[in-house]
Amino acid sequence: MTAPLGWYRLILAVGVLVAGAALLARFGSPGDARRLDPIEYEVRSDFSHIRIRRQEDVRTLLFVGDSGEEIIESQIDLEQPHNLLLPYSRFMLVSYVIAPEQRRALIVGLGGGGMLHFLRHFDPDLKLDIVEIDPVVIRVADEFFDARADGNARIINQDALKFLQQEGEPYDVIYMDAFLGASDATDASGVPLHLKTAEFFKIVQARLNPRGLVVFNLHRHSNHDADIRAIQAAFPRIYRFGVPDRGNVIVAASMVKKRLEPETLDQRAAEFDQNSNAGFSFRELLRTAN
């Protein structure tokens, strides 16, 4: 599931003698804290314990762990839903700097639909498929985040592996932003284990065009380095973007072996900054990535 918009993780520390709680972003640092927003809705699905909080025009979709920790999956400004509030989601859009010509894209993991809202605004001609395994997430995204299918966007309730095994038109970009409540079927960050194998990466490659790109939202955990090595072994070229002061790394895996020089990326980023309506600076993303 999206993380998107995805992917922030917050740990809610509750103590008997502590009045209040600290909320830590999934992809944030231990120093991040914010006042808890009121709970607006709560539901359990077959995959996750889902909670929605709202503060004025900002609505947040969270997963709740077994010990009560809250994990932010999406955050939307209801007045301007196309604005990406979570930093990691902006870094995922560096895909446009690496592969500027995008006609078809796939998002694995819906969450609250932040990426859907952004791409409708930023690239309205883009043909977009979104695969989400949890039907409750799809319903919640519709009812609370106005994230639903339209003429250029399909939302498919299916496991991503099964979807990608089917025949279909190739994608220019695939965004991997799938997270569930942590379980024996996921890694420590909530990524389904069957979406991390060498076999899965081969299936993904088969659904890309020859110059296609896969963008992974990775959370730093005990096997983080192994995750990057597995992606590096499967794809001809990778680009890494560490999100400043956060616990996540965006890895863009390209089918094109030749490396794009930093000067080329910077030039493309400057062109997007001048001509697009992203609401953030692509050059700033490249400059601040670590």
Model-derived segments and spans:
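The AdoMet/dcAdoMet-binding core of the Class I SAM-like
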Residues: 54, 83-213, 221-224, 234, ...
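Hydrophobic membrane-insertion alpha-helices, especially the h-region
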Residues: 11-23
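A SAM-dependent methyltransferase catalytic signature shared across enzymes that methylate proteins
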Residues: 213, 227-241, 255-259
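Active-site/binding-pocket entry motifs
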Residues: 67-69, 180, 257-259
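Class I SAM-dependent transferase core
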Residues: 29-99
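SAM/dcSAM-binding transferase cores
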Residues: 35-37, 42-43, 47-51, 73-78, ...
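N-terminal secretory signal peptides that target proteins for export/translocation
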Residues: 1-5
